[in-house]
Each structure stands twice: as C-alpha cells, then as structure tokens.
Amino acid sequence: MSRLGGLLLALALAACGGGQSNTIQISPGPVRGMLLQNPPQRLATFSAASLLATLVSHIAPPGVPLDLSVAGSEYLLAQGGTPVCDIAVYHIRYATVGGAGESTTASGALMVPSGLDARCRGGRPVVLYAHGTTTARSFNIADLTGQQNAEGLFLAALFASQGYIVVAPNYAGYDTSTLPYHPYLIADQQSKDMIDALTAARSALPAADAPLTTDGGRLFVTGYSQGGYVAMATQRAMEAAGLRVTAAAPMSGPYALAAFVDAVFYGEVDGGAPIVATFLVTAYQKAYANIYPSAADVFEAPYAAGIDALLPSSLSRSDLYAQGKLPQYALFSPTPPGPVFADSVTPPSTLVTLAPVFALGFGANDLVKSSYRSSYLSDAQANPDGAWPASTTGVAAASPGLPLRQALKQNDLRNWTPAAPLLLCGGDADPVVFWLNTQLMQGYWAAHAPAAASISVLDLESAASASDPYATAKKDFGLAKQAIAANAVLHGATDGGAAAVAGAYHATLVAPFCFAAVKSFFDSQ
C-alpha cells in the first residue's frame, strides 16, 4: 500500500472512531433558527433617560428644527410617550437560508426591556420588525449609535422602552452574514429569515440583563418600505404554517410587486429606481438562475460588469453614484424602446404630483438596456397584470413569459388574506414606493377576504373624520409637510418646497407618523 493510501485509510479509521464502526459520523450543521452564539453579545444598555437623549440627538427630519413638536423624533416621543423601561440591546447571530435555499447565516437585534415598572418585566409582547432598503453591507440595526440607524432608534424608543421585546433581523447578506448577496424581495426567503430570527431570539430569552422579562406569547409583525413587504410576506407564511400572529402592520411596502414593476417599466419610474432594480434583478438571478444569460443582456455596458456583486456594498450611495457604479436617477433612455412603444410608455396617471419624479427616471447614462425594456413591455402587453393599468382579475398576470415577470408574479402578495388584524399605513403621494401597492392590496382583499377580516388602511394624506383614531397623525403629518416646504422656500426654493417634500417623503416624513400609528394599533390589540 502506498504511503498516501495508508494515510487515507488511517484518517478514515480515525473518523470512524478507531475502526469500531464502518459508519463515518458527520456532525450536522446548524439548523434554521439556531442561535449561533448563546448568550448573544450585548452591544449596549440604555436607561430610559439616556435613550431619550440619544433619540433626540440622532433623529430629526432634514431642514426641520428639533423644536418642531410635530415632526420626527419629537413627534414620536409625544405619541409614544417618555421612555418607561431600561433596555438591553443584543446582537444575535443565527442560521437561515439564502434565496436559492442554500444554508447561510444572518444577524439582527434583540432589544429587551427591564425595570421596576410592571410594563417592563414579566411576560411581554414581541415586535418582529423588518427594515427598509439599505445599500450598506455593514448595516447592523442593533448598533443604535449609528447615525444612519433611525429605524433602530424608532424601535427602541417606541417599542422597547415601552415594554415590548423587539426582534429585528439585518437580513441575510448584511453585517456578519456569510451570504455574498441579499435576497431582495424574495418572499419565501425573507419570511424564513424573519421567522429564523424570531426563533433564535426566543432561545436567548430570558436575557442576562433582563432576567425577569419573558416572551408573553403575543406577536406583532411590522416593517417599513422593503420591510413592509417582508412583514406582509412573514404574516402570510406564519399563518399558513399555523403560527399565531396577534396583529400586523406593514408600512409603505411594494406588496403588489408585479403591478408596481410593470408601472415602472411603462414609465412611472419611482425615486431611487436604479438601486431597487439592481437589488431586485440580481437577487432574482441568484435565486432562480434564469433572469438573464448575462448581466449585459439587461444592464447597459458601463454598469453590467460586476453588477451581480455590487449590492449591498461597502461604498456609500453617494460613492456608488460618484464612481459611476450606478446612475442616481436614470433607469431608462429618454428614447422610446422602438416605434411600437413611442406613444404608450408613459400612460396617463392620476399621480400628477409625481410627474417630476417620473421624468427623473429618463436620461443619459441610463441603467437598463432599451432592448430589455422592449422585451419587458412586449410581455406586459401580451400578458397584462390584472390590476394595472386596467383592472380585470385584480391579481398578477396569469402566464407571463419573461423570466423576470414570472419571478415578480411568484413574489407578488396578491394571493392571500390575513387572519390576524392588519393595518396598512403610508401616504398616497409617496414617490418611492407608490401608494398603488396599498390600493391594489386593499382592492384584492375587498374581493377575497372574508367579511370578518379586520383590515384597516391609513393614508396619512386623507381627510380625517370626527371618529378617526388617526386624526392627530394626519393633522400633524400635514403640518410637518408644510414645515419642510416652508423651510425649503426660506432657503431659496422656487417650487414652493415641492422638491424638498418629495425628497423627504418616503424615508423621513411618512415613517415616524406611521410608526406612531402602528404603536397605537398594536397597543389596542
């Protein structure tokens, strides 16, 4: 026997326990939802007073003074109340899956309240939160010192400091995750990620810094923007699996995904579309492996090379734009993609106020090849969505031919009805995630949900009635818009502040008011 053969035999016998068995023992890998470090790392503790100081120093809408009581952090404090509980913030790491079902890891935040007040100990409700789109590969919602982590501070101030246990995943592909991409808007994966984070967090309770705080059995699911979509997908998945959700409140999410992307390709281009398109198309390629043979089939030459691995990134958004990795606004060429679409790529829209936003989506150095846009539009015309641009079935196209539209149909959420009470919150002038998504979900549920379903919709732009539980939120939201517009005019804006309002609308204006409304909704359950 050769020395190599003898060595291999010796190793095999060693693996078999010295030759006592002919079966090699292989240690199983971590299962989904396994907490990979127990106890988890504690990142910070906050007294109620120190959390209040941190919140006020970190969060305020751009251009709005901190002493404006109806906006940003001070509005949240007014609606959520002064922090009652001390909180401990833990960084959890757990096992989950990627977009193609591959084993991977992810991380997130576990915020645990404690204190002498009865609201801060014993069996407490759990909020499971899904965050919005971020390009930062290093994003960690558990790091409450980060200047860009408004969501983490919102959660700490509104929920954890008021006695809710908070679980908030960073998602696979971020922070310490071993996945080299993020499975963006893939309903099956993102809901599994959320459920796995919840499972891991529950196994870490009671936490060392809050030994008297336990999971009380009530679960609330919410999220904003991308996270609004993820929250809805998670409620759907949990209820389908027989897991109890007490209530849910998706905020400003792209729920009717197939219709939303159709609208974008027809010419109603949302703000920030190049980032979303890159995340979406490359994630679907990694999950389904059929979106394109080559990235150059979809993306223009200046961007195609390396775009599969571009997001999330170690570069800031401004650096991504400055270095020519992505265009800031121009998704499409201003030249129609062929004569057949010359007069039909921008259908009439009731969203007149968003016309300037749509226009920004067309320009030089655009991201998506006209040939691919033409293929998409041809398929959309041959296999139209059932709710946009014309309402027929109310659901995604029955048999789309283009692989991207097939993937969008697979991930569209117009195919279920909630069992637990649900609140949808947003604003109908949103230039980033169109209110169309909420309208189409509302329309679908009006036709398909049982009469007993408890579904509420809060449009912050709508007029308040005398008995409206969200009348204050609507009024104060309007005042915040006026303040941002007035501040822009004061600093030289000649458009009445419209651009400033549009720029702040999705991430800064709507978010705090929806967060406060969601807290009120959860408290009432």
Residue spans of the language-model regions?
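Catalytic-loop region of hydrolases
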Residues: 20-117
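Short, surface-exposed "cap/lid" segments of acyl-processing enzymes
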Residues: 98-107, 111-163
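Alpha/beta-hydrolase active-site loop
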Residues: 184-208
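Primarily recognizes the serine-hydrolase "nucleophile elbow" in alpha/beta-hydrolase
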Residues: 200-271
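Accessory cap/linker subdomain of secreted extracellular hydrolases
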Residues: 254-415
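C-terminal catalytic histidine-bearing segment of alpha/beta-hydrolase fold enzymes
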Residues: 262, 400, 405-406, 429, ...
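Short alpha-helix in the alpha/beta-hydrolase fold that links the catalytic acid
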Residues: 420-421, 433-447
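Short beta-strand/loop motif that positions the catalytic acidic residue
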Residues: 423-430
